[in-house]
Amino acid sequence: MKKRNISIKSKVEIQELFKKGRFIRIEGINIFYEFTSLSISRMIVTFPKVFKGAVKRNRVRRIFKECFRKQLALLKNRYVDFIFVVYPQRVDVNYCEVDTMLKNIIVHVMKRKV
């Protein structure tokens, strides 16, 4: 079985999502999202330049990716690209916190779908 990649890799797609995507700010995390015609929902976790410490950044990335993967069922065949910009004050997030937050964000995004 082929592993599905949920990351946005293209610099052009990321820049376009920053320009055209909708915006939510929640507790030190900025979220940009846009509905897409692709057959998969994708995401990327990024940080401002002032966020030092690769170990902490990578831990936050892993937590976000795993929680996002588990919450994909809530999207119900609607496909959305997300960018999560995490600021340094949110470096000590735990799995349960991120899981609950992502669930609420996805429900909010689905309600805003036209």
UniProtKB/Swiss-Prot annotation:
Record SUPFAM superfamilies: Ribosomal protein S5 domain 2-like (SSF54211)
Top-level division of the source organism's lineage: Bacteria
E.C. code: 3.1.26.5
Protein's UniProt keywords contain Nuclease: yes
Annotated disulfide bonds: none
Reactions it catalyzes: Endonucleolytic cleavage of RNA, removing 5'-extranucleotides from tRNA precursor
GO BP annotation list: tRNA 5'-leader removal
InterPro entries (UniProt xref): Ribosomal_Su5_D2-typ_SF, Ribsml_uS5_D2-typ_fold_subgr, RNase_P
Chain segments annotated as transmembrane: none
Assigned keywords, A-Z: Endonuclease, Hydrolase, Nuclease, RNA-binding, tRNA processing
Entry GO MF terms: ribonuclease P activity; tRNA binding
Subunit structure: Consists of a catalytic RNA component (M1 or rnpB) and a protein subunit.
Function: RNaseP catalyzes the removal of the 5'-leader sequence from pre-tRNA to produce the mature 5'-terminus. It can also cleave other RNA substrates such as 4.5S RNA. The protein component plays an auxiliary but essential role in vivo by binding to the 5'-leader sequence and broadening the substrate specificity of the ribozyme.
NCBIfam families registered for this protein in UniProt: rnpA
Family, as annotated: Belongs to the RnpA family.
UniProt-recorded name of the protein: Ribonuclease P protein component
Native source organism of the sequence: Borrelia turicatae (strain 91E135)
Organismal lineage: Bacteria, Pseudomonadati, Spirochaetota, Spirochaetia, Spirochaetales
